[in-house]
A protein has these predicted regions:
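Acidic (Asp/Glu-rich) catalytic motifs at the cytosolic membrane interface
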Residues: 24-53, 110, 149-159, 218
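Membrane-embedded alpha-helical segments that form the functional core of polytopic membrane enzymes
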Residues: 1-5, 9-38, 85-100, 204-207
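Multi-pass membrane catalytic core of lipid/isoprenoid biosynthesis enzymes
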Residues: 40, 45-90, 136-147, 180-192, ...
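Long, highly hydrophobic alpha-helical transmembrane signal-anchor segments
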Residues: 1-13, 101-136
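Hydrophobic, membrane-facing alpha-helical anchors
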Residues: 37-47, 65-68, 87-101, 148, ...
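Generic alpha-helical transmembrane segments of integral inner-membrane proteins
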Residues: 1, 21-29, 66-77, 81, ...
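C-terminal membrane-associated helical module and adjoining short loops/tails
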Residues: 120, 124-256
Length: 256
């Protein structure tokens, strides 16, 4: 995101960003491994997650935890090559992510807030690594967008008719909560960001915000029609409409 919105980036910034990318990816991957290990029994009953290596038993739990700790050490070690603010943001992200996996994901609606914060920390870290301050309106927009994305993921899980009248394992939701999650997702994803369209101080962000709303609207529409993969991000990256949106964004950036 910083590269899209910032006018010019130096070569040193690019080099630092590459290191930061791998550093954050390693720490984030550890979180996903923890999550899969803790969700093993639930994933084994899921129609698509049952094919994950840990759920299948290809990777033992002890091996998974060992791998996760190695990734954390490698990620933090890489971050020490960068400025202290990035390292601090990485540690905060790790604490939020791992606390979510081990504990907070069991609490309905709180988990959406924590997931939104985790995604937001990635954006903040992207600015910190190149010694820039992220615009406050952008952070507000991004946070509501990420909560909507987290709500979308939960909504897809609860749209499974086989879960009717059941509580989702290791989650604080029931099948009947899908409408509440839908309301939260639409409110945070569209109504709140729409107010920023009338904020003149972020005029340069309006085209970016409009494209995000278009892409998010397409995802929610497909989820409502039950035509979306369990992973909204995967669906976004494999959707033709998403590429059209990205193409429009690049054209606007180049010719602006």
């Amino acid at each position: 995101v910083p590269y899209v919105l910032v006018a010019s980036i130096s070569k040193s910034n690019i080099d630092q960003s590459i290191v930061a990318f791998f550093s954050f990816s390693l720490v984030a991957s550890a979180g996903y491994i923890f999550n899969d290990a803790l969700d093993k029994s639930a994933d084994q009953k899921h129609k698509s997650k049952k094919n994950r290596p840990i759920a299948l038993g290809i990777i033992k739990l002890s091996t998974a935890y060992y791998m996760a700790f190695i990734l954390i050490l490698c990620g933090i070690s890489l971050s020490l090559m960068l400025n202290k603010y990035f390292s601090f943001s990485l540690i905060i992200y790790g604490i939020l992510s791992y606390t979510y996996s081990f504990w907070l994901k069991r609490y309905a609606y709180i988990d959406l807030f924590i997931l939104g914060l985790c995604y937001l920390m990635r954006l903040i870290a992207g600015y910190l690594v190149i010694d820039l301050q992220a615009p406050s309106p952008l952070l507000a927009i991004a946070f509501t967008f990420f909560i909507s994305l987290a709500s979308l993921k939960r909504y897809i899980e609860m749209s499974d008719n086989s879960l009717k009248n059941q509580k989702i394992e290791r989650r604080g939701y029931k099948f009947q909560d899908s409408r509440k999650v839908l309301f939260i997702g639409l409110t945070t994803g569209f109504i709140l960001p729409a107010f920023f369209l009338f904020e003149t101080s972020i005029f340069e962000l309006k085209w970016f915000l409009l494209l995000i709303l278009m892409a998010l609207g397409n995802l929610w529409y497909r989820a409502y029609k039950k035509n979306l993969d369990d992973d909204p991000l995967y669906s976004f990256l494999t959707d033709r409409f998403s590429y059209i949106t990205i193409g429009i964004g690049l054209c606007l950036k180049i010719y602006s």
